[in-house]
Amino acid sequence: MLRRICLLDRPIPAPNHSTLKNILEYALTRDGVPYRPFGPARWGWGAYTFPDPDQPQRFLLIGLGWGSADPHYMDILDHLTPARLHESAAEAGIDWPSSKIQDDAPLLSPDMLLVRPITPIRVLESVPSGRRPAILQLNEDWTIALNRTMSYRLGRPFHLQMQQDHLFTATQVSVSSRPLSQTTRLPGITASFVLRAPTEFSHELSVVWASGLGANTGMGFGWIHDGLTPAPF
C-alpha cells in the first residue's frame, strides 16, 4: 500500500476536479502508465481542501494526494515528483513552486472515512442470469453489493459499512472507449458519506481509498476531503 500527498507552500483556489485528475494522469502516462478509461481503478487520488475564510462559498486547495494497492502503480507513483506535476499543470495555469511530497497523513479516524467521491460508484444487483442492473439507492442492498464487488475485485472479503451524509445524486459515468472515440456510459452514484469498517478490518478503508469503490471506475478514483485545514499535515 502506498499513499502520498503533495503539500503546497500556500493554499490556492481549488481548481475543478477534472483539472486535478488530468494533472496526475498526464504525469503518469509520461512515466509509462497506459491510459485505461475502462475497468476497475488501479489507483486513487484526493484533493485536500478547506473553506476560504474570506469567501466561505469558495474552497482552497492545500494538497493533492495519490495512492495505490497495485504493485505496478505503487512503484510508479512512488517516484512522482513536484516537477512532474508542475510540467503537467503548466498549461492549466497551476503552479507547485515550493511543494513537497510526503507520506500521506493517517486517516482522521482508524475505522472511519468521511469523504465525498468524485468518481461515480457503480455496483450491480446479484441476479441468476442476464444483465445485472445498477443499484442507485444507498441502502442495505447497495452496501452488500459494494462489499461483494470489492471482494470480487481484490480477492478477499470486505466488511465496509456506509452511513449516508447527504442525498445521493444519480449520474452517468464513462466506463469504456470504443472505436471512433465513442464511449459507453452506465449509471452510477455520487454522494457524501461516512464509510466505516469494524476495528479489526480498519485497513480496508486505506485499501478502498487507493483502489476505488465499485466497478468500472476508469483509470483513477477521485475523492474530495472538504473542510480539512493544513493542521493535520
Label the predicted regions.
Residues 1-233:
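RNA-interacting cores
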